Amino acid sequence: MPKLRSATSTEGRNMAGARALWRATGVKDNDFGKPIIAIANSFTQFVPGHVHLKDMGSLVAGAIEEAGGIAKEFNTIAVDDGIAMGHGGMLYSLPSRELIADSVEYMVNAHCADALVCISNCDKITPGMLMASLRLNIPVIFVSGGPMEAGKTKLSDQLIKLDLVDAMVAGADSRVSDADSEQIERSACPTCGSCSGMFTANSMNCLTEALGLSLPGNGSMLATHADRRELFLEAGRRIMDLATRYYQHDDESALPRNIANFKAFENAMTLDIAMGGSSNTVLHLLASAQEGEVDFTMDDIDRLSRLVPHLCKVAPSTPKYHMEDVHRAGGVMGILGELDRANLLHNDVYHVAGSNLADVLARFDIVQTDDAAVHKFFSAGPAGIPTTKAFSQDCRWDSVDNDRKEGCIRSREFAFSQEGGLAVLSGNVALDGCIVKTAGVEVENHTFIGSARVFESQDDAVAGILGGEVVAGDVVVIRYEGPKGGPGMQEMLYPTSYLKSRGLGTKCALITDGRFSGGTSGLSIGHVSPEAAAGGTIGLVQTGDRIEIDIPARSIKLAISDIELAARRTAMEALGKDAWKPLGRVRQVSMALKAYALLATSADKGAVRDTSKLV
C-alpha cells in the first residue's frame, strides 16, 4: 500500500519542526494523517482568463476539507499572450510554460503533497501544469476558469459576433473607420474567461477532458455561468476520491500516467484534429508526452491527421460559432461521442469522471443520453453582460444543439471536411516537419506556389507587410523566431492579422519557425523544424526563391536543386560563430531568455529543454 507522501513531513519526532510549521498554517491535531492536497491556482489581475480565479481555490479547498483532506493553495505565474503580443513581451510566453511546470513541481515536492488540483485557463498555464502533473505522477485533476462569452455588436444595422482577432484586424485595417474600430475593440472581449474562440487556451482545456484529467464541460462551460461553480466543487470531491483510491487501495488507475497514456494522447490529438484546435496544442501535447514518458511523436500526429475528419468548426475558422456554441452542442463530450461512433477513439481509457471514457460518454454525450440534468447542463448559455465576475449569470438556451447534420458539431457523415483541422507537412524546408491549421485555410489555398519574401524577425515582417513590401503571391518567411532563435518562439498573430487587413489573407502564405496564436487563420505554417538557429533549411531560403506548398500531399518544398542547397549550407557554415544567426537584427535578450535558449529544442520535440546538454 503506498504511503502518503506527506508522512515524510508530518510523522515522527524528528519532524516536530515541520509539524510546528504546519500547525501555523491552520493544521490541527486531528488533521495529521489526512492527505495533503495541493491546489495550484493561477489567479492574476493581468489576464482576463484568470482575473476571476481568486476565490476558486477556496471553493475547491472547501470541498476537499469536507471530504476529509487538507487543502493547501499556492499560485503560479500567468502570461497573457494577447497583451504580450507584438512586442518583446512575447519572447517570454513559451518559456513561461517551463517556469510554471517547474514551480508546480517545486511546491508539490518541497512540501510532500499527496495529490494536486490544477486551476488553470490560458495559453501556457494549462500546458505547464499538465507537464508538471505527468512529471510528478500523483493523483491530479484539472479545472479551468472557462471561456469568455463571445463579443456581440451591431455594425451597419447587422448584429455580429466578435472575438479578440476581430479587434486586431479592424485596428490595422485603414478601411475601417475609427468609430467602428473602437466599437469592435470595446465589444470583442466582454467578460472574464479565456478568449471565446477555439484558440490555444480553450483548445488545451478541451484536451484535458480527452486526456481523462478533467470533468465534462471543463473546456466549454462559460466562465460567467453559475453552473461552472459545480465543476470546482466536484473537482475537490474527485481529487479526494482519486487520492483514496491510490493511497488506501493501491489503485494505480488513479495516477495521471495511467490515465493519460498513449491511447489517451491519441484521443486528445484526434479531438484536436476534429475540432480544428490551435496548432500550439501540438507543441504542448508533445512536451507533456515527454514528461509522462509516453512515446507520442510527430509521426503519430501525422498518421492521425490523415484519418480524422473535421467535425467542429469554431472561430477563428468561422465567425458563426464560438465556445458557447460548442457547449450548447454537447461540448467536448459531444465531439468525442461522434468520434467514438466513427470508430476513431479508444473508449477503454481511464477517466477522472468515471471508470473509463465509454462510461463517461454514456452519461454525458447528449446524443446518447436523455438525462434532463445533462441536457440542462449543456444548455447553459451567455448573458451578454460585460463582467469580470465568475458565476454571475444563469442564462440558458431554449434547447441543446444536437443537429449533427448542420449544427456546430457534425457527425462523420456530415463533417465540415473529411480532412481534419490540423496537418503535418514535411519537405526540404522542414525536414522534421511543420504544422498548418487546415481548418482555417481556404480550400483553394490547399496548394500554393509563391515567391519567398524573407524576414529575419517578426518585427521586420510586420514593417514589411504594413509598408507594402509583401504582395499577392508571396510566401512570407519569418525565421530565427524558434525556441532557440527568438528565443522563445513568438506567436505570429500580428503578421497574419495585418495580411488580412491589407486584403492578402487568402493571397499569401506565411511560413515560420515561430508559432501562431490559436486565433490565426489563413495559410499559416509554423513550427518549421529544425528551426533556423538549429541549422534548419529555413535559414537558407532567399527572397525570390520558389516555395511549393501542397497540403493534400503533406509537403512543403524549397524549389532549388540539392546542389544549390548544399552550396548555401556550406557558405553558411563558413561564417563560423556568426552562422545560423539573424542578419542585422537588434534585439535585447535578457539573461533569463539566454538561459532558456541554451537548452531549448525545436518544435518537433515540443520545444522542451534538452537537459542532456547539462551532462
From Swiss-Prot:
One of its GO terms (cellular component) is cytosol. The keyword Amino-acid biosynthesis applies. It holds the Pfam family ILV_EDD_C. It catalyses: (2R)-2,3-dihydroxy-3-methylbutanoate = 3-methyl-2-oxobutanoate + H2O; (2R,3R)-2,3-dihydroxy-3-methylpentanoate = (S)-3-methyl-2-oxopentanoate + H2O. The modification N6-carboxylysine is found at K124. The keyword Transport does not apply. Its EC number is 4.2.1.9. Pathway: Amino-acid biosynthesis; L-isoleucine biosynthesis; L-isoleucine from 2-oxobutanoate: step 3/4; Amino-acid biosynthesis; L-valine biosynthesis; L-valine from pyruvate: step 3/4. GO terms for biological process: isoleucine biosynthetic process; L-valine biosynthetic process. Binds 1 [2Fe-2S] cluster per subunit. This cluster acts as a Lewis acid cofactor. Homodimer. Functions in the biosynthesis of branched-chain amino acids. Catalyzes the dehydration of (2R,3R)-2,3-dihydroxy-3-methylpentanoate (2,3-dihydroxy-3-methylvalerate) into 2-oxo-3-methylpentanoate (2-oxo-3-methylvalerate) and of (2R)-2,3-dihydroxy-3-methylbutanoate (2,3-dihydroxyisovalerate) into 2-oxo-3-methylbutanoate (2-oxoisovalerate), the penultimate precursor to L-isoleucine and L-valine, respectively. This is Dihydroxy-acid dehydratase. The gene is ilvD.
